Amino acid sequence: MKRIVVVSGLSGAGKTTAMGFLEDLGYFCVDNVPGNILEELLKLFMSSDLEKMAMAIDVRSEHLGDPISTVERIKEKTNALVIFLEASTEELLRRYALTRRRHPLQKDGLGLEDAIEKEKEILSHIKEIADVVIDTTRMNTHQLRETLAHFLVNQAGGTSVRIMSFGFKHGIPMDADFVFDARFLPNPHYVPELSSKTGLDSEVEAYFKNYPVVEEFIEKIFEVLKVAIEEYQRTGRRIITVGIGCTGGKHRSVYITHRLKEMLEREGFTVIEKHRDIEKV
């Protein structure tokens, strides 16, 4: 089965890294697809021996046609996976300061921060129709490639669920569709023999088994996610991201994330488990 991936997103958010990774995976990569040759390009790909093609579409494509309508047409005509990359304005400013590159919308006296905000506005609809939105604010190159690999593995299937534990003190994952707050639950951090362990350790699991409210909370989240996933499958959504947060992202959120993965997999769902802050202090 032929695969098509569309990569869009904010300048400086990692599109070059993403396209390089896709090329390493054997995708035929096309940068800034002109809208007026899209139909011909798709026909050539479908009739060729190529199995995988990736297309990058961003604000630089504006002089070659409307990037939004281009992405919409690709989604209408193919089973393409649309990936949108973003990062916080502060992080994009930092990255541009390091590279000293000029933002593609920085012209006619427009400052960098204003150019970033203008780009967010232009591409907002592509973000809305994307199958996957990845916030790269706290990601390095390796983590972005790893995240892309997870999504690409599941491209051919139905709706996949990405469950991420995190610590609120390290920031909420901006790409999460759902965020659940576990900070009200008993905290093993204050038990000396458990403080250095994580929610993946059997001793921490045994601790949580003493508190029925923990299992009740997990069951409630599970029921919500089941309803949401089934509805997303009906509407064709490929990926949903769920954030489970506690204070530091080491005990409560990790345990709940792992338990939910097991429960959802038993229901036949494809689940990606990630513990963002488990190694942080």
Swiss-Prot record:
GO terms for molecular function: ATP binding; GTP binding. GTP binds at D58, V59, R60, S61. Disulfide bonds: none annotated. InterPro entries: P-loop_NTPase (IPR027417), RapZ-like (IPR005337), RapZ-like_N (IPR053930), RapZ_C (IPR053931). Belongs to the RapZ-like family. The keyword Phosphoprotein does not apply. NCBIfam families: PRK05416.1 (NF003828). The lineage of its organism: Bacteria, Thermotogati, Thermotogota, Thermotogae, Thermotogales. The keyword ATP-binding applies. Displays ATPase and GTPase activities. ATP binds at G9, L10, S11, G12, A13, G14, K15, T16. It comes from Thermotoga petrophila (strain ATCC BAA-488 / DSM 13995 / JCM 10881 / RKU-1). This is Nucleotide-binding protein Tpet_1006. It comes from the Bacteria. PANTHER family: RNASE ADAPTER PROTEIN RAPZ.
